[in-house]
Amino acid sequence: MNTNPNSIRCSDCAGSSRRDFLKTTLAATAATTLGSIPIIGRAAEEAARPKSETLVASLYKSFNEAQRKALCFPWDHLLRTEVDNNWHVTEQHIGSFLNADQQQMVREIFLGLHSPDYAEKVFKQVEDDSGKAGFGDSSIALFGEPGTGQFEFVLTGRHCTRRCDGDSTEGAAFGGPIFYGHAAQGFNERPDHPGNVDWYQAVRANEVFQMLDGKQRAIALRNKGRMEQGSETVKLSGKTQGLPGIPLTELSQDQRGHVRKVMADLLAPFRKEDADEALKYIEAAGFEHLHMAFYKDQDIGSDGVWDVWQLEGPNMVWYFRGDPHVHVWVNVKAQA
């Protein structure tokens, strides 16, 4: 089901060092965290849009018999919980299988799953990474039935797994595991990842590493990141100790505060209700139980600005793999 594009070396490989990039970019990225977004204004903007769940129900009702047979599945179907970096949940692509009105509904559903500040940027990323077909290369599936309390929409493609469930999936932020990523200027990105819509998150994470002393860095810096193996990539351990990297209990108050800024950056692209739910689950399991790890074996440019890193706790994995381009794997659940 997966497809892997051929490696393409970027032709424009000159530029300033990433340390300079970090310095010049931090001021800009500071404005993109959740803490800098006025909550009232953000909520009002999101409230003005049709709710994604409402649009999913309308989409379901619009299907003809052939579409329903191809795209609709029972709630407990195994495909509902799958996640991967480059896959299609169904064989039918929306650009050729849905009519124009239905395609527009899917677009609005996708946009509505993201915050107003990021929705169009993330949509453009999916367009750019999907080749000539653009967003139309995506595929969708619907599980369960509207009005039953068990109903979920899943959209997939290259660098995309998103879900819309109206909290049908109890105790799962974002409706279950999700994936996002970007190959901005070719398969093999330059060390500073120019044009990558997600790289600002790694910029913030590297700030945390710069705040660590030598002893802390020795704990936080590991060799190689986890293997990418579909849903296994985001399997939760349930553990509060012994996870890769440095536990937040070993950080100072200022350092932990900066990790909270990283978390805000990670949640910033998503609609407020999903971001709030994810943070609620993380806090309930104990923010102090998170571990932060950086991986030195996948350092593009060998300059000590870490392209691969993660936050992991007993009930969450947020794995950022920035080599050779950005893949981000996410799974956040309520505490068991």
Where do the model's predicted regions map?
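A cross-kingdom marker for long, charged
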Residues: 45-65, 69-336
